[in-house]
């Protein structure tokens, strides 16, 4: 059970999440041994306090969910999150820049956050449902050049989620030290297993407990 739990970012990103729900999320992560909790930036400080001294990481999102912030805003948001206790950052690429062929801009979004340090895990969210396969490959290459740790399929807010095909494509187009996070629509053990078999080594889901208790 614990091995599967360690694949999961226990996620609560809905805008109406309450303090009680965040505390419950953290307690669940401690109980089941999830890799991290993934919360919105406002809740990072609380999550860090609740998880202090444990091996459950605090993950938050940057430029979420649209990715359309300026690079400067994303860098500030990332720096602020790290100061508040975040250990993993899931940042959304500038999707419009990628689709416009403005790859240098998209690269700098990632690189300037990476330049904040190597003491945190950086995951780059592609939002695969909005990209062509060629664009997905390009973002994987940019992420590798910027020394990101992961590429991630989706925010879960754009109408599409992780697919087996996308996970395989992403895995095939990242550097050997990088990993893939599948997120969006992973709600049961069968889907999680398929994502892992396709090459994902981290899963983002709000159905974590349902999955673990089905083992």
UniProtKB/Swiss-Prot annotation:
Cellular component, GO annotation: cytoplasm
E.C. no: 4.1.2.4
Organism: Elusimicrobium minutum (strain Pei191)
Keyword presence, Iron-sulfur: no
NCBIfam families: deoC
Predominant cellular place of this UniProt entry's protein: cytoplasm
Record protein name field: Deoxyribose-phosphate aldolase
Example of a GO MF term: deoxyribose-phosphate aldolase activity
Keyword Cytoplasm annotated: yes
């Amino acid at each position: 059970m614990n091995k599967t739990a360690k694949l999961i970012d226990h996620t609560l990103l809905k805008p109406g999440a309450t303090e009680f729900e965040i505390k419950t999320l953290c307690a669940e992560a401690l109980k089941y041994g999830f890799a991290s909790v993934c919360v919105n930036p406002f809740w990072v400080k609380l999550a860090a306090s609740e998880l202090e001294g444990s091996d459950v990481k605090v993950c938050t999102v940057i430029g979420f969910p649209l990715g359309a912030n300026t690079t400067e805003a994303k860098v500030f948001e990332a720096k602020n999150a790290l100061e508040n206790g975040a250990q993993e950052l899931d940042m959304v690429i500038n999707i419009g820049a990628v689709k416009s062929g403005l790859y240098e801009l998209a690269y700098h979004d990632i690189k300037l956050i990476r330049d904040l340090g190597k003491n945190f895990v950086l995951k780059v969210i592609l939002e695969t449902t909005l990209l062509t396969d060629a664009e997905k490959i390009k973002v994987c290459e940019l992420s590798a050049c910027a020394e990101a740790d992961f590429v991630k399929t989706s925010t879960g807010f754009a109408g599409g989620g992780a697919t087996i095909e996308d996970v395989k494509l992403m895995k095939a187009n990242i550097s050997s030290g990088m990993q893939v996070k599948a997120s969006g629509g992973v709600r049961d053990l069968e889907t999680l297993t398929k994502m892992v078999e396709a090459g994902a080594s981290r899963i983002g889901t709000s159905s974590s407990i349902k999955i673990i208790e089905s083992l």
